[in-house]
Amino acid sequence: MKKVTAMLFSMAVGLNAVSMAAKAKASEEQETDVLLIGGGIMSATLGTYLRELEPEWSMTMVERLEGVAQESSNGWNNAGTGHSALMELNYTPQNADGSISIEKAVAINEAFQISRQFWAHQVERGVLRTPRSFINTVPHMSFVWGEDNVNFLRARYAALQQSSLFRGMRYSEDHAQIKEWAPLVMEGRDPQQKVAATRTEIGTDVNYGEITRQLIASLQKKSNFSLQLSSEVRALKRNDDNTWTVTVADLKNGTAQNIRAKFVFIGAGGAALKLLQESGIPEAKDYAGFPVGGQFLVSENPDVVNHHLAKVYGKASVGAPPMSVPHIDTRVLDGKRVVLFGPFATFSTKFLKNGSLWDLMSSTTTSNVMPMMHVGLDNFDLVKYLVSQVMLSEEDRFEALKEYYPQAKKEDWRLWQAGQRVQIIKRDAEKGGVLRLGTEVVSDQQGTIAALLGASPGASTAAPIMLDLLEKVFGDRVSSPQWQATLKAIVPSYGRKLNGDVAATERELQYTSEVLGLKYDKPQAADSTPKPQLKPKPVQKEVADIAL
């Protein structure tokens, strides 16, 4: 019966798309150089790059909702972290010999420096205005308890001192010092509990929705840019000349139109996978998606909000996925400070917060169903974790909060449903299918269509991700002197690494901090904390590395 239902649904969707395409033929076809599907931060960032690189190119952006930045980019639908691995412990895994690997942390930090430079450049151009409206200095802290976790954090701190990107980080195991950094976390805590924390002053809280709105508002000032809201893509068809005909439905009046584009970018968040599949390119067959939602506890009580100015990340329990890392964060949303705690995982078959319950079923195909099954079998701990999260009661969530805020009061907090994230499942020759952390740019061989899949670190690395896309689909142009000069004007460190170059790191941090109105003091010598001799890590089954 389930198979029949799925088949009938697929037929209905297919017939509807054919009907839409037929109706669209009767209307005049719109032509554009670049079609941006989705009104989120990825499309906005790519459009902003292309506006500087090729100002004469025409661009059309289509968004199914009534406004831009209303899904994952919306400030209330994500954690608002400027992910730079200053506090996220899952980016520094412990190796089997007990040492700490910092390669992933360095890569994440390098990527965020590109985002800072991109935003600073847009402020200087007048594209982004009033930096305080979208980015603010909020110290980033890691906080752990228990002897093993304290040893891990001490070793992590020592390992990160090898990189110029993490200079200025401080470490402490002293209750009084940590209380000064994060009073809300320490007040009411057992004074005998073994704790440790790191703190980096240059952490940030970012409103990605505000960045998106400002970037798109600037694009709209040009006559060769068109924004179409309440417009949903129903079909994509490759033409003989390698252009694309995209059928777009107007959700308000029920009409449809065809847009003929030389290049199509699918930056539709959770909906990107289904649209990529609709395109029919062979590269899409390697991917499936699994949706995971998130909830946060929110407090707007001034007694709580004014007592906490930091993003404080903990450590996932043994065997739990990194998505379970709790954090209690200062946020600045719509000009107002609030405190969020979470996330708590939720499950829905929707790929978007405003999506359809049929999303998961309609994206499941004969080519990706086996990789999905392999991932489910290989990640039973993850399945158990998700089930346990869905079963959490109000009291369970409050008890989790009290581990980070011992004196919390229930009446100060409310539960908020944040956005959906579609985790990448990719076909793997060895394992059948693997769950992937991060984002991936998937494109056809001709470089005429590209999609962004994945969830983390997401918006905080929009600028470097879109740079990767430019290099992948516009390789010849990227290597030209004109594009090289423009890209280096947008991102001064483009083409080189900051890690290992103290002077270059300090120069870029000083520049972006001044333009974006962020705090930055030149780092002093690192604390002389001894590096512990960690015990070799017991051999454990690899945990799926995914994140909300």
Swiss-Prot record:
Organism for this UniProt entry: Escherichia coli (strain ATCC 8739 / DSM 1576 / NBRC 3972 / NCIMB 8545 / WDCM 00012 / Crooks)
Gene3D superfamilies tied to this protein: D-Amino Acid Oxidase, subunit A, domain 2, FAD/NAD(P)-binding domain
Superkingdom, natural source: Bacteria
SUPFAM superfamilies for the chain: FAD/NAD(P)-binding domain
Pfam family, one: Mqo
Record's catalysed reaction(s): (S)-malate + a quinone = a quinol + oxaloacetate
Protein name: Probable malate:quinone oxidoreductase
GO molecular function: 2-hydroxyglutarate dehydrogenase activity; L-malate dehydrogenase (quinone) activity
Enzyme Commission code(s) on record: 1.1.5.4
Entry keyword set: FAD, Flavoprotein, Oxidoreductase, Tricarboxylic acid cycle
